[in-house]
Amino acid sequence: MSDSEDSNFSEEEDSERSSDGEEAEVEEERRSAAGSEKEEEPEEEEEEEEEEEYDEEEEEEDDDRPPKKPRHGGFILDEADVDDEYEDEDQWEDGAEDILEKAPNIDNVVLDEDRSGARRLQNLWRDQREEELGEYYMKKYAKSSVGETVYGGSDELSDDITQQQLLPGVKDPNLWTVKCKIGEERATAISLMRKFIAYQFTDTPLQIKSVVAPEHVKGYIYVEAYKQTHVKQAIEGVGNLRLGYWNQQMVPIKEMTDVLKVVKEVANLKPKSWVRLKRGIYKDDIAQVDYVEPSQNTISLKMIPRIDYDRIKARMSLKDWFAKRKKFKRPPQRLFDAEKIRSLGGDVASDGDFLIFEGNRYSRKGFLFKSFAMSAVITEGVKPTLSELEKFEDQPEGIDLEVVTESTGREREHNFQPGDNVEVCEGELINLQGKILSVDGNKITIMPKHEDLKDMLEFPAQELRKYFKMGDHVKVIAGRFEGDTGLIVRVEENFVILFSDLTMHELKVLPRDLQLCSETASGVDVGGQHEWGELVQLDPQTVGVIVRLERETFQVLNMYGKVVTVRHQAVTRKKDNRFAVALDSEQNNIHVKDIVKVIDGPHSGREGEIRHLFRSFAFLHCKKLVENGGMFVCKTRHLVLAGGSKPRDVTNFTVGGFAPMSPRISSPMHPSAGGQRGGFGSPGGGSGGMSRGRGRRDNELIGQTVRISQGPYKGYIGVVKDATESTARVELHSTCQTISVDRQRLTTVGSRRPGGMTSTYGRTPMYGSQTPMYGSGSRTPMYGSQTPLQDGSRTPHYGSQTPLHDGSRTPAQSGAWDPNNPNTPSRAEEEYEYAFDDEPTPSPQAYGGTPNPQTPGYPDPSSPQVNPQYNPQTPGTPAMYNTDQFSPYAAPSPQGSYQPSPSPQSYHQVAPSPAGYQNTHSPASYHPTPSPMAYQASPSPSPVGYSPMTPGAPSPGGYNPHTPGSGIEQNSSDWVTTDIQVKVRDTYLDTQVVGQTGVIRSVTGGMCSVYLKDSEKVVSISSEHLEPITPTKNNKVKVILGEDREATGVLLSIDGEDGIVRMDPDEQLKILNLRFLGKLLEA
């Protein structure tokens, strides 16, 4: 073929191609102007064929075009290579390339294309309706995707392929890390943005593209720019970025996408796992996952409904308006009750296994099934308590209590420890048992217990649960019983029953809250202040023993046998009763740690060890009793000593091994006279040569109020807290400081003799030829036989007066000088404060006022084990009154016999005037000069000053003698208690205070802090100078003696010497002697 023919052929092809292009364009415009509603498939195929023909012709003409034309075409094609093909189809109309080739320059082509496009758009808007325009654009632009054309029409592409076009390339800006001040990353990014805006329209705008400050990156920000110099220009002058001004690190292209990668934590919720609601009426309620819809981001929950039955009732009773105006009240959790809803007029429909009410679905068991958004629930770290689970479902149906939502990137929430036995609860190895070797966060490494598996296996924490078998000894590490230990007695599917070591209760605990252990619980609470079995005070009148320790509460067995639950703060103080002593049913001394038998009451037949004594109650521990950890309480009169008691410090034995049976003798609150008078530092003083072991504790001195007589603390007063043979620990009143003092330097308050004074036993002869002078060992019986000793143990309880009326006594006339009546002792020495050798001249007569040699003349209270306060004077008339007809030295007148008044001041009464033998006392005599008044006997004993007497003395004055023990002894301080009204006796030294009434605020040893109403001040007075005020009708009273001591009540009426009292706790009526009652201060 010749060149001319070739050129002609090419020209024909060009013309043919151009004509074809023009026809296509005309056809397109014609269809647009006519407003055709759809394009048929043959037309689409023709367009594709035309495109293919155009591509082939383009390739064939590459060699035949003039040099300039290919240059224009090459430029366009190069740009097309970079861009995607589907963008060409979207941006260029068909035949646009032909127009460009024919155009003389590219500017005209762009202008013509804009004009034609605008013209066509105007035609469309003018001629077409909105629906037709929408359909046109849908068909125009919703063509098949590039993937269908390039990759053979696949429906969808993989994510990797579709995201490739969005990845950064070499021609994109780079990310540069710049060191920033920690904590100021976000503020620095904002300041760079403001700087960019400020420089945007200046001659030197910033060349950076963006700034990124991710939340998880500390100390760095990312700056996007093409060059490092652009970054330096931008950060120059920014204070927070001066650390990174000289060094910026470029992020590799492959790692740039990780900077902005957002990983959203999606909770791994599984059916039957637990969640809590965040808001609304169900806020903080526990719920169980029924199923999850990840696509809709919803979750269906099973929960206990909260239905407002009052609102339903109000609505059904045409009170809609009122119900709406009512203040919103959150209804309680309650299972759905269809019958109750119907009874209120509600409409309940049935839908298969569910009941429908107000659009909500309820199961037949009453649970609500409702869908919530994922954002409305708390899915992480939800651990239902055992009480919630029991309330949620009585009999769990395959519920896995150990399913806990997965926690990623957070603090581990399991409590697995190396050595725990575990079991796989999900996965392919379910039910495989093993032992934990190591714990690394949520990854647990175990050694399986299987013959075919010899290697260690690693599991996530949520796939394991603890496994226990019967007989394991475990410790509770969480929950209500935290800290308790016990033996597993039963293992159920979802919880474990263990038998507590300490309280001997059965505890129901979740397996996750247990841990294997070998030790036993200490029985001390979380704060370390209280322990199991400790005696605590619940209120001023009630004590109890802690029988169960829980995290926030105690269970206390009170003195009435009831178990009460109290919070830790309600226990005010501990009671220390290590030295308490009581009497059993056979009048035996019983102490703490003694073994006793119960012979009466609800616990009759039991045997136990005394743990605590309080008043007339004893708290016992029996190992055979399961209830309350073996602790029970009963009254001391229902006990009998079973024999041997556990070893204790026995330091109170008297001469010849005699052990006093009175609990008052060894009680530190009521020290015996031996401790007061016998000399603190004299080993063997008053004990006939028998001394305690060196360094052993002296219980007699503990609790006494003493004054320091020598040394740097001379004159200080304090209470003895501990004492040995040589030293004593004294707590000073003024400084609240406890110091150690030599016992030789101590003097008890109320005594004028130094404590270290030796005994004067055995001086022969002394005054009145008494052998020995103080008669410490020659009396038989040595101590006056008081039976019974304690108030409350007598039968009958009140009165105990034999005979009750005059004339029934046998013998009717018997004086104090009757040799058959042992007038021993005649008088308690400590009624007066005097020294042994104060009398300047010896009197030829005994202290009783007659020359009759008394043996002994008066009891020597220097024996450390004898408390003369409690020695009854037998017979009723002491020798001091000089009235007996048996005196060999005097012939009394017919009226010489009288009975002393049992008032508190009786021992200070003067001797009677010429009614009988009148004795002339020496100047140093212990008795005041008698006045000429006649003595008037008083048949009614006083609350404190009455000395028990036995019949036998003549009583012309008509005095009724009483059985020993029926009254309150002269110097007894047992009646002293707080909050009662008292009167200061005339024996007190301060005359301004004598006769005033007050209220006892506190009692320390024998000293009482009394608030005096008249002078409005608080003074410390010994109990021997106080007497209680007798209450009257309707007064608030407090029992000061007897088995009901410390109990309070109201005095309803008075019948002779008795009063009818309505007790406070149970409003029980009791008849009590008025001597046993003290008047309480009324508000």
From Swiss-Prot:
PANTHER family assigned to the protein according to its UniProt record, in alphabetical order: SUPPRESSOR OF TY 5 (PTHR11125), TRANSCRIPTION ELONGATION FACTOR SPT5 (PTHR11125:SF7)
Keywords: Acetylation, Activator, Isopeptide bond, Methylation, Nucleus, Phosphoprotein, Repeat, Repressor, Transcription, Transcription regulation, Ubl conjugation
Modified residues annotated as Phosphoserine in this record: 32, 36, 662, 682, 785, 800
Binding site for DNA: 615
Domain of life: Eukaryota
InterPro entries referenced in this protein's UniProt entry, alphabetically: KOW, KOW_Spt5_1, KOW_Spt5_2, KOW_Spt5_3, KOW_Spt5_4, KOW_Spt5_5, KOW_Spt5_6, NGN-domain
Name of the gene this protein is made from: SUPT5H
Identification of the protein by name: Transcription elongation factor SPT5
UniProt-annotated stretches for the region 10 X 8 AA approximate tandem repeats of P-[TS]-P-S-P-[QA]-[SG]-Y, motif CTR2: 840-946
